[in-house]
């Protein structure tokens, strides 16, 4: 399965993120994709529009539900190979790690280490 960046050109992604932010200024565009070396399933919809004041932990909970993970199954998200604190707000993650195309890219895994 192609990554979001492989599916769309930079101009297409930039236009989409600008449109999203203009239409929903209190939300941020997030792309969540499976880490290639994890045994977790691929998520059907990669794009998320999350409230700026949502915590990373709340976002992980939503991802777990979308992936239909069993209650004890661990799920970790990485942004630029970094494990953000679960208490961090998505807005601060976005401002620190947003891509040139206006999206923030998160990679999910069942392992706490990346690489």
From Swiss-Prot:
Location, primary (coarse class): membrane
Matches recorded under Gene3D superfamilies: Phosphatidylinositol 3-kinase Catalytic Subunit, Chain A, domain 1
Annotated membrane topology: Lipid-anchor
Keywords: Autophagy, Cytoplasm, Cytoplasmic vesicle, Cytoskeleton, Lipoprotein, Membrane, Microtubule, Protein transport, Transport, Ubl conjugation pathway, Vacuole
Superkingdom in the source lineage: Eukaryota
CDD domains found in the cross-reference section: Ubl_ATG8_like (cd16108)
One GO MF term: Atg8 activating enzyme activity
GO cellular component: autophagosome; autophagosome membrane; cytoplasmic vesicle; microtubule
Tissue-level expression: Constitutively expressed.
Stored InterPro entries: Atg8-like, Ubiquitin-like_domsf
Lipid-attached positions, Phosphatidylethanolamine amidated glycine: 115
Any Gene Ontology biological process: protein transport
PTM summary: Gly-115 forms then a thioester bond with the 'Cys-558' of ATG7 (E1-like activating enzyme) before being transferred to the 'Cys-258' of ATG3 (the specific E2 conjugating enzyme), in order to be finally amidated with phosphatidylethanolamine. This lipid modification anchors ATG8 to autophagosomes.
Family of the protein in this entry: Belongs to the ATG8 family.
Assembly and binders: Interacts with ATG4. Interacts with NBR1.
UniProt protein name: Autophagy-related protein 8i
Lineage: Eukaryota, Viridiplantae, Streptophyta, Embryophyta, Tracheophyta
Gene: ATG8I
